[in-house]
Amino acid sequence: MKVRASVRKICSKCQLIWRGKRLSVVCVNPRHKQKQG
């Protein structure tokens, strides 16, 4: 899980999801998991 100021899709399978007030990226590849912090 990477915590970044700006999250973005890395590949075509990445999905941007709002979790409460946090924007996060969920993907098949676990290395692509990100959350905004």
Curated annotation (Swiss-Prot):
Compartment annotation: Plastid, Chloroplast
GO cellular component: chloroplast; ribonucleoprotein complex; ribosome
GO aspect biological process, one term: translation
MF-aspect GO terms: structural constituent of ribosome
Keywords: Chloroplast, Plastid, Ribonucleoprotein, Ribosomal protein
Origin superkingdom: Eukaryota
UniProt entry tagged with the keyword Metal-binding: no
InterPro entries tied to this protein: Ribosomal_bL36, Ribosomal_bL36_sp
Family label: Belongs to the bacterial ribosomal protein bL36 family.
Protein name: Large ribosomal subunit protein bL36c
Organism: Gnetum parvifolium (Small-leaved jointfir)
GN (gene name): rpl36
